[in-house]
């Protein structure tokens, strides 16, 4: 500015606010992690010298992100006025293509609105994508399924007769709307998101081995990447009773997870079991556009074998082909995924609606994790948000 002061301008406003962050009142997001690069000038030495003689500032470097503006806008618009988060990753590289959290805020006037933002009961400054901790609901059945596969090599022979509810030692779990799914194998159990079948599966699991599988899926673990996050938690004890065990198997109970973590999990499944380290910065360029630093994809670790990933993909395809994610079938693109409806109130009327999965199943392109808080599922679901994001990518 003319008076020597500096102002940060955010032309994209609320759409990128959590992931880009703000530079006032402390820093957040990329403004925090990339502050050094933004202030460093990789101009040529003689130019820097000339500028100093003229009392002119050297232009700081430019941080080029991995974010796809169209996907970011699509995710932002798809959430509408709902609270929640969307994370989109490229499974083969770990590039974060979109990261949206709502409610949002305008980073252009954080200083002026600081007190109101800090006292906001909707926590609009909170990046729900990485810091939000949610009951995973039926998306956690992917972990339960993997644990069952590992403990039961003959899992293809699994059979269960669902009559809409399952009781054990005084504890009863109901299927959604108490729907009786009839005779099911493991594929059907995942596709129908059958709570009764998964309660039965949970009771058959060795809890210590189950916990081990959950840890390998990054629960109770550090997550890769450079964003601030909260660790997800799997708390089922080895001496837990039947009720807690059944609830945990279907993704209720005390398990907590972030949308960021679930994006990594489905990204690894899409990538043959191998998780690529998530990253947000593609390159750093100087004022002339010359690249001074380029970030390359990095493998983080193998979460599961390629055959386990392929089997989970088959189950997730069934979810879309004839199960709870059928609203995503018949599009110009293919999807494999898992839905979730997490009850978060005593009366069961308040739910978080989830969808996790990936598109272009034979050569995966987009891994997505959606959580809609307190969703009115008559008007919005995790599936409907994911569909809008996929549609914007494949139909434009």
Predicted regions and their residues:
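Extracytoplasmic/periplasmic proteins that interact with beta-lactams or build/remodel peptidoglycan
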Residues: 1-85, 99-100, 104-128, 133, ...
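Solvent-exposed, polar/charged alpha-helical surfaces in well-ordered, non-transmembrane soluble domains
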Residues: 4, 8-21, 28, 32, ...
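Intrinsically disordered, low-complexity acidic/polar segments
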Residues: 28, 365, 377-379
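Short hydrophobic alpha-helical segments used for membrane anchoring or interfacial signaling
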Residues: 86-91
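Beta-lactam-recognizing serine transpeptidase/beta-lactamase-like catalytic domain environment
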Residues: 92-138, 143-374
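Short, gly/Ser/Thr-rich active-site loops of penicillin-recognizing serine hydrolases
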Residues: 291-296, 384-396
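A short acidic/glycine-rich loop-to-helix N-cap element
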Residues: 372-385
